[in-house]
Amino acid sequence: FAMTIVITGCITELGKNLVGRPRPDFLARCKPTQSSIQSTKYHNLLVDHTICSTPITSHTLADGFKSFPSGHSSMAFSGLTFLAWYIRGFFTAIMRKLTCTVYEQVPDEEPIRLEEGLDRETEEAPQHLVLSSLVLPLVPVILAAYISVSRLMDYRHHPTDILAGTILGASVATAVYHVYHKSHTIKA
């Protein structure tokens, strides 16, 4: 889990510093003054931080240039997608134990597994476990989506920032989970 958070955090910060995209609420952070905007020079466009009345050393203004990708989205999807995979793996392991084959017991010897193709006794996994293994992993993913959409509704990110953070976080979590939890992955 920690590996997922560290990798996602590093990639997110690298992206924010390389891209430097202004946030949707940048003008509210910048507080430009009419005297600093020369309409003939800038044609009423925000060019750089020089038109801002907020000092460039201000954390608020510096953070205004770190919109892409969304850190909240990437971290939420990173941690909560990992949790979703973990929950799915947990239920998969339980169902494997419940549906394992019955072994033939030979006296005074080790148990011998019946060969493939021969009759084997198996138990069906209880339906509530099957349903739980499909529904419960969705809860963390829905929570991550809620966190991401809240950043859009708060006017802190553009939709593409949210999408990039979502893809980044979910991809890193999926990759790290499948590398470190190979025994829980479902084989097709």
Put a short name on every predicted segment.
Residues F1-L14, L27-P32, S73:
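Interfacial segments of alpha-helical transmembrane regions
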Residues V6, V19-P22, F91:
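Short, well-ordered alpha-helical segments in soluble proteins
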Residues I11-R21, M153:
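C-terminal TM-helix exit segments that contain a strictly Trp-centered aromatic cap at the helix terminus
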Residues L18, P22-T33, Q38-Y42:
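Chymotrypsin/trypsin-fold serine protease catalytic domain
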Residues T33-A188:
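Membrane-embedded catalytic cores of phosphoryl/pyrophosphoryl-handling enzymes
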